[in-house]
Amino acid sequence: MARFIILFLLLAPVYSRLCLRNHPDTTWIGDSRSDQSRVNQQSLDLVTNFKGILQAKNGNGLMKQMSGRFPSDWYQPTTKYRILYIGTNDCTEGPNDVIIPTSMTLDNVARDLYLGACRGDVRVTPTFVGAAELGLIGRTDALTEFSVKVLTFNNPTIVVVGLNGMSGIYKVCIAASSGNVGGVNLVNGCGYFSAPLRFDNFKGQIYVSDTFEVRGTKNKCVILRSSSNAPLCTHIKRNIELDEYVDTPNTGGVYPSDGFDSLHGSASIRTFLTEALTCPGVDWDRIDAASCEYDSCPKLVKEFDQTGLGNTDTQIMRELEAQKEMIGKLGRNITDVNNRVDAIPPQLSNIFISMGVAGFGIALFLAGWKACVWIAAFMYKSRGRNPPANLSVA
């Protein structure tokens, strides 16, 4: 039996396959080249027979849109399962954008925005901004319902952005001649914040974006990333908390630089996605947003990184080595079990022998005791005496 199992494992097909959820309750969110929320006909052809909802709502990328304006209805799908495509337009922010004191890191911004948009319910709301010129005690101008505009302050001003208890992320950019945050002098640039921010002695211009708020992370989602290296989307790729993702292949050319609407121009990606959306035999009632199948055994996409695996031959060799290692462990386990089974008869024999010796000894003791009783009773009778009751012979 063990040999049959090993032979079966050796002959079993070794392959890997990515399956994206192709189901009416799945929303595909793409990366378009502009703020226009659209998926053109070529893109529809790309995902042939896609049964879900096609929605290109992250126009220039989530982080990039914080420098413009989110569409008022940005990303409000009602489906439970989602596929979020991250293209090159999502990766254009650079480290020079994060220089305002107390700003979040790009890694943390990417994690909260993309992981939140993938799994959570998103709401875009205006960011509160309040301002009070120094010397005007008791006066505060609350600039409510204000977002994605630039204000100019010609006199030293206290500027407060955000409210206590707020949730979400907003972007601020400044061009100031004076001002500080917590005593640290300002440097012109931008930053991302998830808590209220106060500028003291501020003179110059300030830009504040909408607040991007994520509520809950209850949805199942896979993040599909471009494998293009121009530009590098390092602040997304190196974040380990974006754990359900897969890179598009770069065989036959890299992902086009102008975004989701040009995906139809890359044959390798068109083939990749078409096959990923038409995986046969996948029970989507049991498998979540995406799966990777090794020998018909579903695994999460986070265990599968096409770019990291290298070419197909290398992957097959790795899979074969893994199978051989598993077979070796199986063989060692079978040998160990056989050794234990072979060891059982001697152990049982020793037990039976010990029990036999003990039983024979007890029998001899009882026989000797009975003999002594008979001899004592006989001696009493030979002398004409009646033996004691405890020496009576039955």
UniProtKB/Swiss-Prot annotation:
Catalyzed reactions: N-acetyl-9-O-acetylneuraminate + H2O = N-acetylneuraminate + acetate + H(+); N-acetyl-4-O-acetylneuraminate + H2O = N-acetylneuraminate + acetate + H(+)
GO terms for cellular component: host cell membrane; membrane; virion membrane
Presence of the UniProt keyword Membrane in the record: yes
GO MF annotations, alphabetized: sialate 4-O-acetylesterase activity; sialate 9-O-acetylesterase activity
Enzyme class: hydrolase
Cellular compartments annotated: Host membrane; Virion membrane
Topological category with respect to the lipid bilayer: Single-pass type I membrane protein
Chief location category: host cell
Residue ranges, annotated region (Highly polymorphic region): 335-358
Origin: domain of life: Viruses
Residues in compartment: Extracellular: 17-347
Motif (Cell attachment site) on chain: 119-121
Residues annotated as the enzyme's active site: 32, 261, 264
Keywords from the named record: Fusion of virus membrane with host endosomal membrane, Fusion of virus membrane with host membrane, Glycoprotein, Host membrane, Host-virus interaction, Hydrolase, Membrane, Signal, Transmembrane, Transmembrane helix, Viral attachment to host cell, Viral penetration into host cytoplasm, Virion, Virus entry into host cell
Biological role: Performs attachment to host receptor thereby inducing virus particle entry into target cell. Binds specifically to 5-N-acetyl-4-O-acetyl neuraminic acid on host cells, which plays a major role in cell tropism of the virus. ALso mediates de-O-acetylation of N-acetyl-4-O-acetylneuraminic acid. This receptor-destroying activity is important for virus release as it probably helps preventing self-aggregation and ensures the efficient spread of the progeny virus from cell to cell. The highly polymorphic region (HPR) modulates the virulence in host.
The protein, known as: Hemagglutinin-esterase
Gene: Segment-6
